[in-house]
């Protein structure tokens, strides 16, 4: 029986933990990134999002750029991040200027790569991640062992 580790957030820590501790494969061995691997989430929002089958995850009515109110999860107070208002998720890895990722990852669209054209590339990226999540859940229904990995924020 194969083992599939799926991160349920709260930041990228669970995905890293899963890869470093053999709970899931790494990309080089075929792992497909899932929606909660590289973002700042919260467990109630994750549960609601899964119950909604990701219906509002990339919905235009719930996406905006928001200033982070505090330092947490590798983000800096005042940093402007893509935010889902329904689930209270921050998409920090695709936000303008976060950690200089647009430079280090060579985003072809520059600093606004994921927010231009009404978040078109953000939606494309996360739709792929949602499909990977669904595929892994289906594999679990077909006999693979699924291990959900979740961290929580401690104030």
Task: Write out the residue ranges for each language-model feature.
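Extracellular glycan-modifying ectodomains
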Residues: 1-155
């Amino acid at each position: 029986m194969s083992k599939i580790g799926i991160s349920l957030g709260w930041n990228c820590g669970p995905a890293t933990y899963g890869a470093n501790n053999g709970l899931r494969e790494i990309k080089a061995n075929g792992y497909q990134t899932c929606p909660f691997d590289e973002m700042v989430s919260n467990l109630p929002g994750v549960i609601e999002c899964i119950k909604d089958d990701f219906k509002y995850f990339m919905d235009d009515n719930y996406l905006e750029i928001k200033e982070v109110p505090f330092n947490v999860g590798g983000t800096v107070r005042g940093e402007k991040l893509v935010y889902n208002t329904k689930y209270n998720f921050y998409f920090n890895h695709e936000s303008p200027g976060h950690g200089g990722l647009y430079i280090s990852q060579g985003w072809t669209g520059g600093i606004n790569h994921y927010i231009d054209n009404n978040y078109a590339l953000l939606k494309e990226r996360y739709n792929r991640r949602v499909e990977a999540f669904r595929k892994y859940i289906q594999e679990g229904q077909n006999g693979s062992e699924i291990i959900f990995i979740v961290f929580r924020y401690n104030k």
